Amino acid sequence: MGKAAVTVLMPVYNAEPFLNEAIDSILNQTFTDFEFIIINDGSSDRSEEIIKGYADSRIKYYKNEHNLKLIATLNKGFDLAGGKYIARMDADDISLPTRLEQQFELMEKNPEIGLCGTWYESFKDGEILGQVRYGPDHSTICFKHLFQIHLSHGTGMFRTSVLREHGLYFNPDFSHAEDYELWSRISAVTKLANIQQVLYRVRHHENEISKKYGDIQAANSYRVKEKLFNLIGIQVTREEMDLFQSIAYHKYEHSDKFLDGATVLLEKMLRAKGYEMFFSKSFYETMLAEYWFNLHYNTTPHSGLSAFNKFHASPLSSLKPVALSTNAKFILKGLLKR
């Protein structure tokens, strides 16, 4: 019997309350050519009993005699995987029935893609809390990675050959942001994509990582952002990283200090030399131009015509032409300063 096309990799640590649902969601996939590697990371609850209760031959069960933690267990799973692709699965989440099929088909049709995610919905106690819809293409994902993770770990499907060719593993120095950090490295050697459909469900509960280790996760996420800025050739402070996130989310402070800081940062980004490893010049400059315009246009009612003048004084304003009608509205907003 040949190797399976996909390895589904699921670490388990004391996941008893949710484990059956997680396992069933994989075994009931429309795509069936997979091996299901389940690694019990030293659980002290009934997790092992639940796993061993399944007779499906696709399940390959491994047990860590001691709790190695998530990153070491995932890296062990990378080495054990025999599939052309490796799909991640968390032991408290749910994969919707066509998830593997759709990701496999996308990866097969697009050999340049080495990591594929999907949209997901979050839920708690049976109630849907909302959906997370990430951008579809490599450039969008990489640009947004400068201020937030933009591909969900649990939904990820890797091209195994890319991982092995470049020696890519999760980095234990970035605990609780290990996915974000790996994305920063894998995106420099292959393309990323997100399927524009909800194919995964993320469960929220009292023991989830973001609640228990939020401070560590935040600190290590800052380190990843700093690393990404460095890769495109920019040295930034934590304050500048926060400023860029505010600009991206249209959370503007109506002050000269905010505008001046944004000007320094965005013009610094315009002068960057290393961004072409992630996206084209036209994409990068268009994104900066849109941020530059939105920043000034939306702060004009508070800053008056000075915002309009500052907008046109920067080389950023020439990256994307502004229609005459829009310029007229821009001036009018400035004249109607509150």
Task: Report each predicted region and the residues it spans.
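N-proximal low-complexity "stem/linker" segments adjacent to membrane-targeting elements
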Residues: 1-27
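Conserved donor NDP-sugar-binding/catalytic core segment of glycosyltransferases
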Residues: 98-130
